[in-house]
Curated annotation (Swiss-Prot):
Gene: CSN3
InterPro entries attached to this UniProt entry: Casein_kappa
Keywords, in A-Z order: Glycoprotein, Milk protein, Phosphoprotein, Secreted
Similarity annotation: Belongs to the kappa-casein family.
Secreted listed as a keyword: yes
Protein name: Kappa-casein
Role of this protein: Kappa-casein stabilizes micelle formation, preventing casein precipitation in milk.
Residues marked Cleavage (site): F70, I71
Amino acid sequence: IYYVLNSSPRYEPIYYQHRLAVLINNQHMPYQYYARPAAVRPHVQIPQWQVLPNIYPSTVVRHPRPHPSFIAIPPKXLQEKTVIPKINTIATVEPTPIPTPEPTVNNAVIPDASSEFIIASTPETTTVPVTSPVV
């Protein structure tokens, strides 16, 4: 209780002792709160990462930009306006007519029918009688 009251001017409970952030490998750091290393060598070289050569290409592609003095801008030339005929780039799709096969009618000879209603067609193996459509 004595430590809490003396260390906190606002008399608030402090659960962790407030310490400043100090590097561990600082040679001037007091070893009060840390375990003292077994062998203290003050002039030991701290291993560092080696600077490797840049052998890998960068992922960003850099495009060179020429100086404006090297950019050639052609002068504006007055040209006669040529009439360009408009070409319809959207071709109209015309449906291709598909020939529908007409059924060939081969009537059998009916003895009661007259000869003007019999249609003789190319010889086929099947015969189809013609019936009048009923309306």
